[in-house]
Amino acid sequence: MLTAFIGMPGLGAKLLAMMNSFKLGRSFEIGITIVLLAVTLDRLSKAWVVKQPEHFEKGTPWWQRHFFLVLGLATFVFFMVIAQFIPILDEVGRRQSLSMGKEIDGIIKGFLNFEWVKASTEFIRWFFNLWILIPTERALLFIPTFGVIAAVTGICYTFGGKRPALIGFIFFTIVAALGWWDRAMLTLHSTVTSVFLSFLFGMPLAIWAARTERASRAMIFVCDTAQTFPSFIYLLPAIMLFGITPVTVILAILVYTMVPVVRYTIEGLRGVPPELTEAADMAGATRWQKLWNVQLPLAMPTIAVGLNQALIFAFFMVIIAAFIGTRDLGQEMQRTLAGTHLGKNFTLGFSVVFMALTFDIAINAWAEKRRKMLGL
């Protein structure tokens, strides 16, 4: 998908063109194609890793020991031969395809024409823009450059100590010196806002799922499946509901970053030693007291890993969101990747990397300190 930024042919370039022209039916078909390819390769690699060796009696013929390999090769050769005589087996042309892009477009338009859908999407768009995105964006852009650097340095010192604070100061000073500070702040705004909202929605969901083994397994399965999907796939439903707006970008990143938040929160809560929760029960603690005073504090190092991954995913997703048009570093990178402005490309890339590394180092340092404090 990323190669579509530099004009490489393939499904990525086709998807980019369809999304920019708002042809959601064809976009959905291309997206499903990429997802199926990704899921197939993912499941194949997992099956290969967990496959146990088979043992046969001495003297078993080679073809019996490798029966499925022989069967697969025979099937491959059979279709290679027969495809020379039946053209549709050689390649399914676009005229013979089972495309339902127009029908899907019709279904989407019909769904969006329901009054309750219009009212809901309009309210969400209005609420996010008026009460979340615009105020926080203006506030961040209003703060002077060195005010932001000082704030980041202070946050890094509070969570990680002197080394993360020094690294944060150096990295954000470099970002300021590179000349794309306003776009960097828009990128930071989208990232932090999305991750904050992903925790706001993801934490209650994870806490609920962590209560039982069955719910935990089901939620982890959903997270595994969601992580298999290419990142851009989350843009499609957001575009369908909210059009090409800043709200679309925030909601797509929110859904994408909820996966590590939910996964690591569940793992952290389920990983609390049973004897500690039993001690809390014996002391007469209520469910909420046990959660806030025992389980969450002990799970925080693992939850911090989820926060770290969510931030990294969000910075990555902001760049992907340039497919539908943004005003941040991703948009500038999309404009220059297909050209010969290598210096500008490196400058923009380093700006994103330095911001991401700042938070990565600070969060990891805090998680390590927390583990030592808890004796984990």
Describe each PLM feature range.
Residues 14, 43-51, 183, 187, ...:
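Membrane-spanning helices that line or support transport/gating and their immediate boundary helices
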Residues 1-3, 25, 29, 34, ...:
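Transmembrane alpha-helices
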